Amino acid sequence: MIEPKKSPAFQRILSGYLTFQLKKHFHRIWLDDDRQRKGQGLMLVNHSSWWDGLLVFYLNRHVVKGDSYAMMSRKGMEEYGFFRKIGAFSVDRDSSREVVASLRYAEERLKEDKTVWIFPQGDEEHVEKRPLTFF
């Protein structure tokens, strides 16, 4: 399993760049969140576009405002290593040993009252694809 290696300096730079890019590419980002949350938790989100991982980072910085981690495929981590700097850790679905290690890592973060983001579908899929499949 590839563990995160967070970099506060990189996160500040990415946050500024990402805010600029989101304003450039989206009319608005709207969040309907009337839940009364206490502490952090497990966030399960759809994975329908390449923006998703970056939106998770943005939402954590501007809405959740906590220490956050996200599960990402090993292949994706190897291809886009910068995600390590913002809290991504890997999972290799082809290795049951690594799946267990990744789930244990997520469990440890949750016990520390951190937020853990998971894309249960495992792959980028069209939002209307049915039936939903989980890795």
What do the predicted segments below correspond to?
Residues 28-135:
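Soluble catalytic domains of membrane acyltransferases
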Residues 12-28:
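Short coil-to-helix leader/linker segments, especially the first N-terminal amphipathic alpha-helix
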Residues 3-4, 19-21, 41, 81:
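Homeobox/homeodomain signature
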Residues 1-17:
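Helix-enriched interaction subdomains in cytosolic or periplasmic regions
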